[in-house]
Amino acid sequence: MYPDGLCKLDDHTWSKCIEFEDVNYQLAKPDDQTAIFEALCDMYNAHDASIGMQLSLVSRRMNREDFVKRIEIAAQGDHFDHIRELYTQMLRKQLERGNNGLIKTKYLTLTIEARDSKTARARFSRIVMDALNHFKVMGALAKELGGKEWLEMLHGILHPDGERFAFEWSWLAPSGLSVQDFIAPSSFRFGEARKFTMADKFCAVSFLQISAPEMDDRMLTELLDTDSGLLVSLHIRSMDQNEAIKTVKRKITDIDSMKIDAQKKAVREGFDMDIIPTDLATYAGEAKNILRDLQSRNERMFLMTFLVVNFSDSKQKLENDLLRAASVAQKYNCSLVRLDFQQEDGFVSALPLGVNRIKIQRGLTTSAVAVFVPFTTQKIFHGGEALYYGLNATSGNMILADRKKLKTPNGMILGTPGSGKSFSAKRSIVGVFLNTKDDILICDPEAEYFPLVNRLEGQVIKISPTSTQYVNPMDINLNYSEDDNPLALKSDFILSFCELAAGGRNGLEPVEKTVIDRAVRIVYRPYIADPRPENMPLLEDLYDEIKRQPEPEAQRIAAALELYVHGSLNVFNHRTNVDINNRIVCFDIKELGKQLKSLGMLVIQDQVWNRVSQNRDQGKSTWYFVDEFHLLLRGEVGSWSVEIWKRFRKWGGIPTGITQNIKDLLSSPEIENIFENSDFVYLLNQASGDRKILCERLNISNQQAAHISNAGPGEGLIFFGNVILPFADDFPKDNELYSIMTTKLGETGKGENEHE
């Protein structure tokens, strides 16, 4: 093995290995499945008889310590260590429910003959690049393995329980050891005919005997769906096209000869000469079909060896695993046959090295080989600040996603009432709080979030006509805009505010907008000159300044604003008197009346923008969760929401809209921009009308749509950039966090005032 990933198998044989990731094949639309299948055919056809291919699919356990380390949240000696422990308990329990730490990896090993390493490298540079391009067409991320990565992969197969791999190239010369010494298990024993042991594992190698007239693309997926270690290897080598055609023609000639003999025998015995053995007629038809495929349908002939290695903890478990694998093969009219007295050769041949010592080969055309599609479903398992979003409903893999990796991290949580929208948002809030240092802001129209916010020692701001908690809509920080004039954007907000307060049916007239803009610039002069809190203007200052303007329109605006300054709706004419800088701030607007609801939501949007612009200079992200998001999509509030959705990404803002009203989301081209500017969509159960709209908008296949039809709470589809995964999140009800986050009657309230 060379450091650059070139492997020397013998004096003239060399190999290279490519690791490729999964794509969403099983749940894709039929057209997309066909495109992947055709791309796979093209890749096989691109390799001539001088290139050996080995497709290896590995299912093994990840190192338990490493796996747990990626999901555990370390204690920090503060009030929230108990919550960290509860959250980690939940993640551990979900891990046990899922695939229990099994990871599935996929490799393509390419083998050529060359006289020396220089010649091999030169030839592999083109071959590997072509293969990577073919995977790109399929939508699969792929990379060429370096020598150390390849050794680590082999070490993982030879140590199925996930022992740690330790190796450096600089260790070889001083130690006198070879690379084999660093990857080999403690022992092998090949003394038995039908199985062998590798360290403390009981193993068996079988080959697939293909007797089905047609294969199914689900067979590999079902074969790999196991809770034990498994290695599936397909050795594939193309035949020379002319030689393949000659071989098939010879077979047809042989069959015709046998047919003539059978006819002669029938005539001698007094039977009709057209009555020939059924098998002969079948073989003749199949051979002619193969010849036609080779000559006119862009098919090639391949020789394939299909090997399966089972790894188990006990003899009984091995027998059970073998029976399960055999039943899968039987389901598709194939047989899984043990390699008697060839266990060692079979195991060496199954390892992703490009070596094939098993001479049991089956001739198949390109389409027949490509039907063994190595793809099932993608995975999202990020490290660092990734949040938990459930378990992959297809593979059982835990979904850990970091939205900051997306081009546009804006998100939507969509679902019918009772599908788990608010619960999913609260689970995300806890994840953000524990996994990051980011700030969290919540717009809460139904007063659902205060138990969680109180538990996390956040600030709940109750905005209502009778509340004594105030937020000043005139608050501004000098970083409010990305240019040097923060007043331009603030003036735009105040115009929207006045539009709602004084605009009437037809909105503000141009002259009225001019008056307001002039007054805004005047009232902010003292604060811009000396930015102290006591110099921050109030709505009353704006009202007084507008009254001083000479235009007649100014008096009309002032008269309309009087209700919000000196009248009964003067909740927004006070200085901010709450901790707006707490890490978690929840704006409770449930008791805002109809007159103030839109104004209240607009003021919250502005406060959020203040916080986002302030945090940007500190290099901190700001998460903004908006429940009942459809309420923010109308009129001036809607325009401001669209503006925020566009601007947030550049400023480190990560907004999440939560709603069941899909039709409101798509009510106008402007509002549609919010949907199109969201690379994260968390789809829970959908009503039939909304489901139809979403399937068209998001290009959802029928198989995927099944996961949002009559789905249980916490089940659906997650859209993460270009990745679509079905998920299920059955949050443990015995976890204390559940009672803080649920909105179900009878299950809420427990622990909401507890503090450590």
Segments (PLM) and residue ranges:
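Post-Walker A helix-loop "phosphate-sensing" segment adjacent to the P-loop in P-loop NTPases
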Residues: G431-L441
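Conserved P-loop NTPase
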Residues: L698-E754
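Conserved lysine of the Walker
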Residues: K421
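Hydrophobic positions on the alpha1 helix immediately C-terminal to the Walker A/P-loop
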Residues: S424
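A short helix-turn-beta junction within AAA+ P-loop NTPase domains corresponding to the substrate/partner-engaging
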Residues: E457-I461, E670-L683
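Hydrophobic anchor at the beta1->P-loop junction of P-loop NTPases
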Residues: I413
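Extended, folded cores of ATP/NTP-driven motor/assembly subunits in large transport
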Residues: M1-T377
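P-loop NTPase motor domains
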Residues: V23, P30-A49, R60, L224, ...
